[in-house]
Amino acid sequence: MSVIEKLIKPAHLIDMRDIIREGNPTLRAVAEEVSFPLADEDILLGEKMMQFLHNSQDPVMAEKLGLRGGVGLAAPQLDISRRIIAVLLPNPEDENGNSPQEAYALKEVMYNPKIVAHSVQDAALADGEGCLSVDRDVPGYVVRHARVTVDYFDKNGEKHRVKLKGYKAIVVQHEIDHINGIMFYDRINETDPFAIKEGMLILE
């Protein structure tokens, strides 16, 4: 049984054992574009990836399955070298602890996503970044674009263009890096990990 056949079995729930770790060559390969109309297995894989993110953000399911929380997942992290990413960004509660009107700021499975424009200004998360494929802490500012325009296709083959900024832009860039064989720590300044470039936004 191939990797993808195992992952898309109806009863299978993706867990941390399915996620490959740094050092695996798939994480350093430039992934292949998917073709349209999508094969059923590509649609099912996208659905399974989104299901994993939902489970990882659910305290009960995360504990049951032993999941680390995640907001994004790329197919290469599952040892599938295809240009598929899933992003699930919850909206925060308000200052009174009330649930947001919209549960998610971004919820999408993107096929063949591509950054088509970006800001001159850079940005980085104040607390740095982590990755489900990296089991160690790598401190430092991960320098990315503050704003990006991304083209992608959905599972029906329809093309979309989204303009993203802030945390949404950071997360999508992290996942697009995965399909290009780039790890987040490649973007940390080796000699001065917390160097701040002129005009760079630090996102709390």
UniProtKB/Swiss-Prot annotation:
InterPro entries xref list: Peptide_deformylase, Peptide_deformylase_sf
Record GO terms (molecular function): metal ion binding; peptide deformylase activity
GO annotation, biological process: co-translational protein modification; translation
Segments forming a coiled coil: none
Pfam families, alphabetized: Pep_deformylase (PF01327)
Keyword presence, Metal-binding: yes
Key word Metal-binding present: yes
Catalytic activity: N-terminal N-formyl-L-methionyl-[peptide] + H2O = N-terminal L-methionyl-[peptide] + formate
UniProt family annotation: Belongs to the polypeptide deformylase family.
Official protein name in the record: Peptide deformylase
